[in-house]
């Protein structure tokens, strides 16, 4: 756990020693990378055995996960109890891999295996993080102000991924979606909220530090 925390801290802070840190954990703690949620689910199902638990995790500021057939777990203690405690035959269970929990719901708790679904709220571009909030309808808006409240929001968003990336005891898969590169008949993006460039930089960065592609 200590080595994983150090690795995640290095990953999020662009530490130049990140590849060496990954070498210290990869033999006993698998982390795999994919752009396909179907493959991520298959990996979790293959590795989760007996009474072990797996689950999908997303940040609270993630927004475009429905096209990947993922819902966010409803707020409230009852939903969280079902997600964490029901067995794999119960559709409310984390093991069903349909409802994703956020950093708020998993803070201080662990699963055996996780899939961290990395949305366009946190994007790696040119060796730094850019932060975005979705307006709920049509577009992402960058969180780039220099006010104290804006700086605090960016700090929270980065820490949310720190929480998500440290919830698995045994191993995890990180899914950075492909986005949608399709065009309408008029030549406009089919889905301007999931353009490939929102995700590609993050995927390339994670790949560059040595994470294996599925």
For each feature predicted by the language model, list its residue ranges:
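Short, Lys/Arg-enriched charge-dense amphipathic segments
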Residues: 11-20, 204-214
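C-terminal accessory regions
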Residues: 96-213
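Conserved helicase/translocase motor-coupling segment
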Residues: 1-129, 151
């Amino acid at each position: 756990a200590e080595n994983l925390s150090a690795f995640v801290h290095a990953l999020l802070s662009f530490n130049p020693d990140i590849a060496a840190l990954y070498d210290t954990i990869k033999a006993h703690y698998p982390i795999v990378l994919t752009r396909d949620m179907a493959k991520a689910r298959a990996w979790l199902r293959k590795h989760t055995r007996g009474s072990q638990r797996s689950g999908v995790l997303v940040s609270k500021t993630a927004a475009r996960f429905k096209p990947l057939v993922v819902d966010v777990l409803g707020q409230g203690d009852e939903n969280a109890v079902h997600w964490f405690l029901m067995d794999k035959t119960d559709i409310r269970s984390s093991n069903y891999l349909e409802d994703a929990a956020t950093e708020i719901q998993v803070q201080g708790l662990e699963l055996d295996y996780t899939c961290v679904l990395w949305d366009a709220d946190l994007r790696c571009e040119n060796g730094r993080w850019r932060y975005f909030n979705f307006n709920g309808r049509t577009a992402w808006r960058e969180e780039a102000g220099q006010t104290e409240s804006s700086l605090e929001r960016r700090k929270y968003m980065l820490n949310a991924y720190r929480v998500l990336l440290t919830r698995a005891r045994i191993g995890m898969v990180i899914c950075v979606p492909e986005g949608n590169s399709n065009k309408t008949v008029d030549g406009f993006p089919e889905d301007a909220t999931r353009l490939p460039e929102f995700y590609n930089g993050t995927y390339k960065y994670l790949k560059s530090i040595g994470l294996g592609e599925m």
